[in-house]
Amino acid sequence: MDADLKNLWDKTLDIIKSELSEVSFNTWIKSCEPLSISSNTLKISVPNSFTQDILDKRYKDLVANSIKAVCSKLYTIEFIIMSEIYEKEEIKSSSNQKSKAIVVNDEMSSTLNPKYTFNSFVIGNSNRFAHAASLAVAESPAKAYNPLFIYGGVGLGKTHLMHAIGHYILDGNPNAKVVYVSSEKFTNELINAIKDDKNEEFRNKYRNVDILLIDDIQFIAGKERTQEEFFHTFNALHDANKQIILSSDRPPKEIPTLEDRLRSRFEWGLIADIQVPDFETRMAILKKKADVENLNVANEVMGYIATKIKSNIRELEGALIRIIAYSSLTNREVTVDLATEALKDIISKKQGKHVTIDLIQDVVSSYFNLRVEDLKSQRRTRNVAYPRQIAMYLSRKLTDMSLPKIGEEFGGRDHTTVIHAYEKISENLKTDDSLQSTVNDITKKLTQN
């Protein structure tokens, strides 16, 4: 750093310190470094996008006015994320080298998130198997498990692993044709191809790749033309010994309205699940996030978050950021008491009534003046069958139980019966106002304390 620039910045910091609380200064300003100064602009590095956003919204004028107080000139302040600087330097230094090919051509512009690598993935008991399977596929594409099918709830790391596979393969072979796409984008591109009479172009795009990663594959269920097209794409790639990686929120056998021929192909390779992280993994995730974002958070605060937020990684990390922001806005240190205040609304929602299949059966049978035994019986009269279907629908929506387990709890029924009930109620809800009211009433009884 230029000596004059350092001197200017040190004097500026003294002024800013006098204007802010110690907590706010340490949280938002201390980690900043001046990069360069021109005739009108001062560029300042910041550790992450969250800090950049806060500085832009709340502290830019303070920084500009503090600098003006030192040198009698008003500069335009530009906050730049440090990682972006490194990326630009790496691109510049390797400009004569062959750049990473993460797409087949410009039209297929699918981006792998640079943050989602194996190195940044936190391994725990809940995801160890899925991580090991993903790494095995990345090390030996189309030789280990093909396809690899990763499933689990929202925000548990499925997308992270898929991007990590793509990065790992490209690091070893920059010329590999790696394509990552959501099932929604795949469907939309197919629709456009049909509309514009470009079917052949669409097929060439997805069948001439080395690695195809499709996220949230469950959303092609019910879309006949998309399933037809993907069936042939799958066959073409598999026959050519190309790697296919799919993710979903549930295993293939539990995806309703998925064609059997696709279901069987999804089960050809390896199916790996990701569960909700345990306490130790949640703590490790929070510590990793704090390190990456350059946040100073005590272990007891992270322990509090890990104890209260158990559902998924996104909510865990979101809770940490919320606490840091709350600390800055209230000019208070990050403590367990402050964390309790910052998360009280979130936690109160999380601590609502725990919904189980037994509870659903009790509430539904009471609502329709039936006995729980009726819902479990083999009776098929409408006054019993329809409430039973509603109870199965709610069991699928409000619990984490698998379809076979739900069927078992309703008199030992097959999982296909549960799928039928779920699909029927889902479809009827679109047009039946009375059913909507019934389901809403029962849901309130189930979820409210």
Swiss-Prot record:
Signal peptide (UniProt feature, chain positions): none
Protein name: Chromosomal replication initiator protein DnaA
Residue segments, region Domain I, interacts with DnaA modulators: 1-73
Region feature (Domain IV, binds dsDNA): 328-449
Species assigned in the record: Clostridium beijerinckii (strain ATCC 51743 / NCIMB 8052) (Clostridium acetobutylicum)
A GO MF label: ATP hydrolysis activity
Encoding gene (name): dnaA
Main location group: cytoplasm
Stretches the record annotates as Domain II: 73-110
Cysteines joined through disulfide linkages: none
Family that this chain belongs to: Belongs to the DnaA family.
Listed Gene3D superfamilies: 1.10.1750.10, 1.10.8.60, 3.30.300.180, P-loop containing nucleotide triphosphate hydrolases
Quaternary assembly: Oligomerizes as a right-handed, spiral filament on DNA at oriC.
Top-rank taxon: Bacteria
Xref: SUPFAM superfamilies: P-loop containing nucleoside triphosphate hydrolases, TrpR-like
UniProt-annotated stretches for the region Domain III, AAA+ region: 111-327
GO cellular component, one term: cytoplasm
Pfam families linked to this entry: Bac_DnaA (PF00308), Bac_DnaA_C (PF08299), DnaA_N (PF11638)
Annotated ATP binding sites: 155, 157-159
GO biological process: DNA replication initiation; regulation of DNA replication
Protein's job: Plays an essential role in the initiation and regulation of chromosomal replication. ATP-DnaA binds to the origin of replication (oriC) to initiate formation of the DNA replication initiation complex once per cell cycle. Binds the DnaA box (a 9 base pair repeat at the origin) and separates the double-stranded (ds)DNA. Forms a right-handed helical filament on oriC DNA; dsDNA binds to the exterior of the filament while single-stranded (ss)DNA is stabiized in the filament's interior.
UniProt keywords, alphabetically: ATP-binding, Cytoplasm, DNA replication, DNA-binding, Lipid-binding, Nucleotide-binding
InterPro entries: AAA+_ATPase, Chromosome_initiator_DnaA, Chromosome_initiator_DnaA-like, Chromosome_initiator_DnaA_CS, DnaA_C, DnaA_dom, DnaA_N_dom, DnaA_N_sf
Domain description: Domain I is involved in oligomerization and binding regulators, domain II is flexibile and of varying length in different bacteria, domain III forms the AAA+ region, while domain IV binds dsDNA.
